[in-house]
Amino acid sequence: MQVANATSDRIISISECLKTSNFDFSVKEGETIGIASPVYNFGLPVTVIDFINKLNISGNIGYVFTLVTFGGLSGGASIMLKSELKKKGIKINAQYSVRMPDTWTPVYDLSDKNKVTETNKKADIKISGIINKIIKKSKGNFDSRRIPFGDKFYGGYEEMRKTSSLSVNDSCVGCGLCAKECPVGA
């Protein structure tokens, strides 16, 4: 959202598109398209792959960038995005990555608020630089935390994405936000 707000671009929610089966978009001549995704198990969430496979864009796209957010390494997510978009005839001009607090709670501890705040501050600085590059329509692979053959580690994703390892404790207020926002309705 930060990038789209800074560049005055429209935001389209992948989760909302999947819920409403809305995959047809038209772009103005030379319009910029950006696809942002979190990294799951060194790759893309199945929802992002599903969205791209169903995506139909009419019009002449001007500049295409991808942005992946990750906790440890971006793995092969940028490689996967490039591959999936290529199947749709969409060529990426720039790839970006930003380290954020890792939110896969079965493994990562988010209870250290100072560490989370520090990671977010660093992310904000990185995002500001990315915004400047997007405005200038910079080209290149700026994914600084990818790993060679990172997409090969993605194999265990199907097992890891199961919700059986997730639980709540007494601090849960029962607001239902996690269930409401879950893109796969878990």
Residue ranges, per PLM feature:
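Cysteine-centered iron-sulfur cluster-binding motifs in ferredoxin-type domains/subunits
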Residues: M1, L166-A186
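FMN-binding flavodoxin-like domain, especially the glycine-rich phosphate-binding loop
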Residues: Q2-L18, D24-S37, N41-E159
